[in-house]
């Protein structure tokens, strides 16, 4: 990886990253590590990498993306491992496709490790200021103007502004400007984006009140212990470092719901004060009570904010109700009867750009050199933001180096499903990733993210020598173990029959491979040790992946067949300037949709709502005609 000098403000940057949340930090680190002169612009340098909402990273589909970021050489997994205080594997009793890692994070520790690495990174400069407008020259983005009157020039500008664009905070019927509680919003940038030609909408998200830990009676709650041993996110890091803490579980009740309903007339959501659309899959507690009146209780996870933090986060009750209603509501929940609120829950409205206005690289269609990543694209969640930040950074780098873009398929990464959904379908509400959004999710397991993406990260210059060596060693061990399992055969002699008897399994009538034995539903890889003690020599992660590949070989083969069947459409590129109005057989509605989305491939065109098989045939015929010309 090349190293260049740290530039001064008047110099030309390769890329300016505006916003230092999860998308911005991931993007800035990746660009700088790949040798590009990068400026990270933030309104508050003390809160770089701040966890604005819940103190947790990972979860269903989200943990998968953290692993993918790590496999490509990104940072979130390493940072989470260093600051994690409770690691749990979700869906551990279910199939490998939906098992996911989630970690409670020490909020202050995470901030420290992110800031440490950002400020120590060569090629990366931090500047505290607010971007006010995009500089446009020669039909492309050329830099930003700031509130301090500075002009910073760059070949590319990447906006990762989170909830800060015209952000407005609501607590009851009181509201005021803010990017999050305690930080000013970005007030000028939205007008600049509209002038460029981007259409902006309005979204809403919310967070819970924070509670004083010493005022909580944990004895009235169910204890949720961490996994022992903890399973880290990073394939390449030193593992989990901090002591592990429990979380606690309690529930709302009818008294809670009565207190909430009593505040409906002062709710900014129910009185129409909030205009932005909220997250369908992370509703406020007042929304849950209103929409599900038949539910007698809702779960609340009381999560530690850190090893030394005096605060706890009651996950499950985000709210924008007035403070007095929040107090009354909290006081009805078992264990929280005497809990003191340190910070109120609140909702925040902010501007976003419908991502259908982006290319698959996350560059805007309206202006070359301008890129968007994170919540500005209508997503919710730290992991979705970080994945987009890395995606955009890799594509900025590819553009700077005149390389083909980084565009993995939906069968290769959850982050590819995320981006494809965004740029193909757009979104009118905060988008959250789920495993159900991926049609090839058995291929997209947490434990094979490195196998799927590390080679790509190496080719792009983000995977360093140490990471590559560790991956290569693991890959060689996996191939060796799989080879042994397929080729080492067991003859059903007396000794073998005795082993099968002790395992409670019928002995085979003829010679079988170890892989054949492992495919039995009740057996796991350690059960094979009496047949071949060499199985114990392999690391746990190698054995886990080998067991998955063997046990699910039939399902995996069928998924690969489906991928191969659709490969032709995914590999058929549509010209960006294709004139859909002249193609015979396309309806006006389909012409409008194709013209708006400008799909990169025939496969992407097929995923646009309303584009029919007949329309795809028309596109194929037109491509053949163009090829003949």
Curated annotation (Swiss-Prot):
Source superkingdom: Bacteria
One GO biological process term: tRNA methylation
Main localization of the protein?
A: cytoplasm
InterPro entries given in the database record:
FAD/NAD-bd_sf, GIDA_C_N, MnmG, MnmG-rel, MnmG-rel_CS, MnmG_C, MnmG_C_subdom, MnmG_C_subdom_sf
Residues binding NAD(+) are 278-292
Its keywords, alphabetically, are: Cytoplasm, FAD, Flavoprotein, NAD, tRNA processing
Q: Which cofactor does it need?
A: FAD
The residues that the entry says bind FAD are: 19-24
Family matches, as Pfam families = GIDA, GIDA_C_1st, SAM_GIDA_C
PROSITE patterns in the cross-refs: GIDA_1
Q: Name one GO molecular function term.
A: flavin adenine dinucleotide binding
The cross-references to SUPFAM superfamilies, in alphabetical order and at most eight, read: FAD/NAD(P)-binding domain (SSF51905)
GO cellular component labels: cytosol
Q: Subcellular location, in the record's words?
A: Cytoplasm
- What role does it play? NAD-binding protein involved in the addition of a carboxymethylaminomethyl (cmnm) group at the wobble position (U34) of certain tRNAs, forming tRNA-cmnm(5)s(2)U34.
Instruction: Please describe the quaternary structure of this protein.
Output: Homodimer. Heterotetramer of two MnmE and two MnmG subunits.
* Family indicated by similarity: Belongs to the MnmG family.
Name of the protein this chain belongs to: tRNA uridine 5-carboxymethylaminomethyl modification enzyme MnmG
The protein's organism comes out as Nitratidesulfovibrio vulgaris (strain DP4) (Desulfovibrio vulgaris)
